[in-house]
């Protein structure tokens, strides 16, 4: 097969490309340039798309003896990821830009161009697995073997078409073994730290970034009784479950910490309350994305609402026609925010199966 190896410049994508070469595929490495502003991504950033990352990716491809290219997706990245991130915070949501990047850039845009150029699949270093059922039907996307690094959640926004053209060669291996393999292969990235930063906010100051792009949109912080506590500069400064940075001088009547429990972007009102006020028992989601067309109606499954969060059993009521679903949780979850992805899993001894996802649009206690 002719495959594109998506080279982030990290150790995982390096080993993924190496394994694809060893498997006999015709491999071409490609690094995605997602910013035209060299100052927007610092060399010290633990992101995934700096100039240093591009150089690391090139060195790996040179070591493997495969072609290497840099593709400029900066315009599409700005529109589909950065602008979406800003717009979501402006309406009181808490988006995950890495999921949107996977959905719109790393798979959709990359795969679209790759197929147009005659490639059969995209190879990445994600910790997830693809398995084929005995009947030869659609493949299953499963959790990676290394549960500490499992990335199936951030792939839950992909559709059947993308999954059919993906390869995840490192998903059946734990991270320490990946580093050992990289070192044995002579890759300079063998000990390179994992990426954590939002790549377009390399200093980690999300509030300052949003303030620059959204500007001042004053509103009020109130408590559960509606008492005004102070003015704020904009709802983009807050997320559900936030405790730090509220800057409320008057303590709560019961002396307990306050948390952001609701954000109303239309009125600019941020409501704070107790930790118990964060508990939800029902999740509503829209913008559904399922890997199998038969996913409709009701089923019992599990849901995960954060990239490194736990799972909770739930009863899902899926309406594909309305593009909505309701999840009744077996146990409450805390701090669930609109804009997060609710990824559904089917428990399985061979590795939990990703069913699909929706974007959280509301909750109930």
Curated annotation (Swiss-Prot):
The protein's job, in short, is: Catalyzes the 2-thiolation of uridine at the wobble position (U34) of tRNA, leading to the formation of s(2)U34.
Question: Which biological process terms from the Gene Ontology are attached to this UniProt entry?
Answer: tRNA wobble position uridine thiolation
Q: Which GO terms describe its molecular function?
A: ATP binding; tRNA binding; tRNA-uridine 2-sulfurtransferase activity
Query: Which residues are named in the active-site annotation?
Result: 101 (nucleophile), 199 (cysteine persulfide intermediate)
Q: Which cysteines are cross-linked by disulfides? A: 101-199
HAMAP family per the UniProt record, alphabetical: tRNA_thiouridyl_MnmA
Q: Which Pfam families match?
A: tRNA_Me_trans, tRNA_Me_trans_C, tRNA_Me_trans_M
Query: Which top-level enzyme class is recorded in the Swiss-Prot or TrEMBL entry?
Result: transferase
Taxonomy, superkingdom: Bacteria
Q: What does the organism's lineage look like at the top?
A: Bacteria, Bacillati, Actinomycetota, Actinomycetes, Mycobacteriales
Family from the record:
Belongs to the MnmA/TRMU family.
Q: Where is this region: Interaction with tRNA?
A: 149-151
The name this protein carries in UniProt is: tRNA-specific 2-thiouridylase MnmA
Q: What is its EC number?
A: 2.8.1.13
Pinpoint the site Interaction with tRNA. Answer: 126, 340
Question: Which residues take part in binding ATP?
Answer: 6-13, 32, 125
